[in-house]
A protein has these predicted regions:
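Intrinsic disorder in cytosolic terminal tails and internal cytosolic loops
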Residues: 1-11, 195, 461-492
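12-transmembrane solute porter fold
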Residues: 13-37, 44-63, 68-70, 79-82, ...
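Membrane-interfacial helix termini and adjacent extracytoplasmic/periplasmic loops
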Residues: 37-38, 104
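Helix-loop-helix hairpins in multi-pass membrane proteins, especially solute transporters
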Residues: 59, 66-205, 357, 391, ...
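Flexible cytoplasmic inter-helical loops of multi-pass small-molecule transporters
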Residues: 190-207, 255-259, 467-479
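Short, hydrophobic transmembrane alpha-helix segments
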Residues: 222-228
Length: 492
């Protein structure tokens, strides 16, 4: 087992700062805009059905470009793609702030999403490659902080901006941050090597994935808006995606250089870790809609106060992230992820028993514990997935993991939104605060069920890691050489 106290090159931490800055800007923007829909509806004099496309258009552009990041990084170099993504996101933010109509705002949000979709996966790729296997866990875990904190801090920051200034500031705030990130990236990020023989773009795979994934995203988003599955806006895109995505899988498995190399899932550690991340994405990003709505609708809290009340969960996650990287090499990613999911489940029960007058102090404590569990579960699984692969496979792995987490989040959000709406309807025509609180409790029980689904993949991940260690010992014994540390252990 490697020495976890081995000093990491300060240059690696400088690269991490650049990556975290870009990632935080991208993740925060999504949740900041979410709280501004009502304001945009009033100021732009457009129906909410049109304003909703400010979010939907952004999500669709994200879903379209994420699968492209692996090929683009190989073809042009990860540093260039990261810089392009920062420029597009910053430019899109400035144009959004200048928009004079809803249609202009939607178009500029799509441009912003093209950049935002590449920032996180390419940043993770750069950081994993720069850190190397021995420091990967400790360094890559840092990139998980903005992903975890974004949904918590976004509503608070958005509420503060909207209460003190123009809605345009929620977009302008990205411009100086983006400019700083671009300058730091130019100065600090390492030059990326190009593939000796850059692969040709898989146009057929791109056509299938660039239509199937956005259609799936759109259909799932419409479930949350319409409150059911019977609408044509839900059924048509979901049915189309049910044809296009399997067609992409069939195509990718039969092609030598597909847009996304799905053969990575033949590796047990990577496949099991990916499943853990899928269910965690569904549980985390799905449940994140419930407590803010509870605080505002049942407890009558403002947007700013709601963000502060959600803070303990973000604090718990942030405190755990730096430490789990040092722990995985001792116990493996699977056991840590299992413990994290178990803690999340235990902390979820008091939330599911929530009432109209439950102590805010108690809710804060429970959220803090839940945040610790999420921090324990999320990053060990992510590091285990990356560390199980060869260096040349990382450009394929990072976008795939991001796609899985986003699709999981979309599914979780859609399911919990439907459960919540039907539970509120079941409470009667004019339900009391206690009745509405009970409806949120019902949805939170469903969230617990989604989290519990991650336990099986955690066990599989544990067994896969043990199998990989055993195989390496046998190979080392057969070769008569020293034992090489397992990749997941060496990663930390």
């Amino acid at each position: 087992v490697t020495d976890t106290k081995e000093r990491i090159d300060p240059y690696v931490w400088r690269v991490a700062i650049v990556v975290v800055l870009g990632s935080l800007m991208s993740v925060l923007d999504t949740t900041i805009v979410n709280v501004a829909l009502e304001t945009l509806h009033d100021r732009l004099h457009s129906p909410l059905s049109d304003i909703q496309w400010v979010i939907t258009g952004y999500l669709l552009s994200l879903a379209t470009v994420i699968p492209l990041t692996g090929w683009a990084s190989r073809r042009f170099g990860a540093k260039k793609i990261y810089l392009v993504s920062l420029v597009l996101f910053t430019l899109g933010s400035a144009l959004c702030g200048l928009a004079s109509s809803t249609s202009e705002l939607i178009v500029f949000r799509v441009l912003q999403g093209v950049g935002g979709g590449m920032i996180l996966p390419v940043g993770q790729l750069i950081l994993a490659d720069t850190a190397g296997p021995k420091a990967m866990g400790r360094v890559v875990s840092v990139t998980g902080v903005p992903t975890m904190l974004g949904p918590i801090l976004g509503p608070t920051i958005g509420g503060l901006i909207l209460s003190t200034g123009s809605w345009r500031l929620i977009f302008y705030v990205n411009v100086p941050i983006g400019a700083i990130a671009i300058l730091l990236a130019l100065r600090i990020l390492p030059a990326s090597g190009l593939a000796a023989k850059p692969p040709r773009l898989d146009l057929r795979g791109l056509a299938l994935m660039a239509t199937g994934l956005p259609l799936l995203t759109y259909g799932l988003a419409e479930i949350g808006i319409t409150g059911g599955f019977s609408s044509g806006k839900v059924l048509i895109p979901l049915l189309a995606s049910a044809i296009l995505i399997p067609a992409f899988v069939w195509h990718a498995l039969g092609r030598k250089a597909p847009l996304l190399d799905l053969r990575l899932y033949r590796q047990g550690t990577y496949a099991s870790a990916s499943l853990v991340l899928f269910f965690l994405g569904a549980a985390l990003f799905g449940a994140i809609i419930l407590l803010p709505l509870y605080f505002q609708q049942v407890r009558g809290e403002s947007v700013i106060d709601t963000g502060l009340l959600l803070g303990p969960q973000g604090l718990g996650m942030a405190l755990m992230m730096p430490f789990v990287g040092r722990m995985v090499d001792k116990v493996g990613g699977g056991p840590l992820a299992f413990i994290g999911v178990a803690v999340t489940l235990v902390a979820g029960v008091p939330l599911a028993l929530i009432g109209a007058h439950t102590s805010l102090v108690w809710l804060g404590f429970v959220q803090f514990v839940r945040g610790i569990g999420i921090g324990f579960a999320f990053m060990p699984a992510f590091v285990a997935a990356l560390a199980a692969l060869e260096r040349q496979q990382l450009p394929d792995a990072s976008p795939q993991l991001n796609v899985l987490m986003r699709v999981g989040g979309s599914i979780g959000t859609a399911v919990l939104a439907v459960v919540l709406e039907r539970a509120i309807l079941a409470a009667g025509h004019a339900p009391s605060a206690a009745g509405v609180a009970a409806a949120y409790g019902t949805a939170l029980w469903w969230s617990i069920g989604i989290s519990a689904a991650a336990l099986g993949p955690c066990v599989w991940l544990t067994l896969a890691e043990r199998s990989a260690r055993r195989a390496r010992r046998e190979d080392a014994d057969a070769a008569g050489g020293p034992l090489e540390p397992p990749l997941v252990e060496a990663a930390l």
